[in-house]
Amino acid sequence: MVRRAPRAVTASAAATAARAAPTGANAAAAPTTPAALEAVRARIDAVDEQIQALINERARLAQQVGISKAKDGHTVDFYRPEREAQVLRAARSRNTGPLRDAEVLRLFREIMSACLAQQEPLKVAFLGPEGTFTQTAVLTHFGHSVRALPLGSIDEVFHEVESASADFGVVPIENSTEGTVNHTLDRFLSSPLKVCGEVELRVRQHLMGAMNALSRIERVCSHPQSLAQCRQWLQDHLPDVEQVPVASNAEAARRARDERGSAAIAGETAAEVYGLKVLAAEIEDRSDNTTRFLVLGRKLFAPSGEDRTTLLVSVGHTDAPGALYRLLEPLARHRVSLTRIESRPSRRRKWDYVFFIDLEGHAQEPRVARALASLKKRASLFRVLGSYPRAVQ
């Protein structure tokens, strides 16, 4: 059998194909005869061939970038979060539909993930078990071509990245309804790790199970928070079904897979991992429930153009009048927007506190750099935990 090499597709050929594709009213018009339908299918096949050839060409170009850097004697950073954010923003800005922006971003994320895996598959530790929203955050940010490592605690995630057993880690930092994950903040007090990315994930709760109908459900298992977030839907649709709180939504999904009559409330990733059917989608009572996750790494990265910086600072004697104002005044003077501030006990001495601050911009931007230099002079403790691309959605 002779294997034919894929026909090379140039940028001009892709542009020609794009011009030949139907647009506007013609794109919406359905074929009215069998012959017309076959013609449309033939065009789809041709476009698929071009897409596949272009994706492979992109993968070859990505390999060339890595080889070129290695030959020059540079330390090769195969994963560049600032570059990936720029690519995603460009894809979003080009999008004219009919695909939604979210779908375009997901497709480009997976293409970049697959291309990166050809060079150096990333190992990403996350707060497990499998099927949790944290795993969904990993896949949203890195794509499905990474090696995702579920761990039992936030401490373990930090340790895996600190010891270089994992390239990156993903941990929750705050939820729009539940507030801050304090243990994540506290871990930064003793860790050298940097923040090199963020993920903002809309928490979508789905009812899932192995059965085909709601009438076959005898009990619904989920984490207590998820049960509370879906209280009204459960009251309206399954008022007589037992609600069983469990340690995690992943545990709920496992029980739904293994126990006859059990269903689970969990995220879409849990349905994929445990092979369950989604019986009812997005059953949460509030549609604005969002969790923010941080991506942990061992180094800082260059600006992407739309960035956020996270600081760890202390003013020393926080009981002195105006101490916090004097600490933060340089941000206002240099017109740097503060988006979040949290206080935590410093663990150094009684009633001594540190502040975790999020602000707009990258630490290397001149305006931000001037503000931080002034702030550093007023602080008894000052650390830039990270400057990283804002979540692309």
Annotate each language-model stretch with its function.
Residues 2-393:
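Domain-level signature for soluble enzymes in the chorismate/prephenate branch of the shikimate pathway
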